[in-house]
Amino acid sequence: MADTTGRIPLWIIGTVAGILVIGLIGIFFYGAYSGLGSSL
C-alpha cells in the first residue's frame, strides 16, 4: 500500500464522486420529467 497518511483514500473519492454523479443525473431527469429541467 502506498503512503496515504493525510490523504483521502481513492476508493472514498470514487464512492463520493459516483454518488454525486448519480444524484445529479437523478435530479436532472426528475426535473425534466417534472417540466422543471428547462429552468436549469
UniProtKB/Swiss-Prot annotation:
GO biological process: photosynthesis
A GO CC term attached to the entry: photosystem II reaction center
Transmembrane segments: 8-28
Keyword vocabulary terms for this entry: Chloroplast, Membrane, Photosynthesis, Photosystem II, Plastid, Reaction center, Thylakoid, Transmembrane, Transmembrane helix
Pfam family, one: PsbJ
Superkingdom of origin organism: Eukaryota
Membrane topology: Single-pass membrane protein
Localization: Plastid, Chloroplast thylakoid membrane
InterPro entries referenced in this protein's UniProt entry, alphabetically: PSII_PsbJ (IPR002682), PSII_PsbJ_sf (IPR037267)
The keyword Membrane belongs to this UniProt entry's keyword annotation: yes
HAMAP family: PSII_PsbJ
Quaternary structure note: PSII is composed of 1 copy each of membrane proteins PsbA, PsbB, PsbC, PsbD, PsbE, PsbF, PsbH, PsbI, PsbJ, PsbK, PsbL, PsbM, PsbT, PsbX, PsbY, PsbZ, Psb30/Ycf12, at least 3 peripheral proteins of the oxygen-evolving complex and a large number of cofactors. It forms dimeric complexes.
Similarity annotation: Belongs to the PsbJ family.
Role according to the record: One of the components of the core complex of photosystem II (PSII). PSII is a light-driven water:plastoquinone oxidoreductase that uses light energy to abstract electrons from H(2)O, generating O(2) and a proton gradient subsequently used for ATP formation. It consists of a core antenna complex that captures photons, and an electron transfer chain that converts photonic excitation into a charge separation.
Family annotation (NCBIfam families): PRK02565.1
PANTHER family linked to this entry: PHOTOSYSTEM II REACTION CENTER PROTEIN J (PTHR34812:SF3)
Stated name of the protein: Photosystem II reaction center protein J
Record organism: Oenothera elata subsp. hookeri (Hooker's evening primrose)
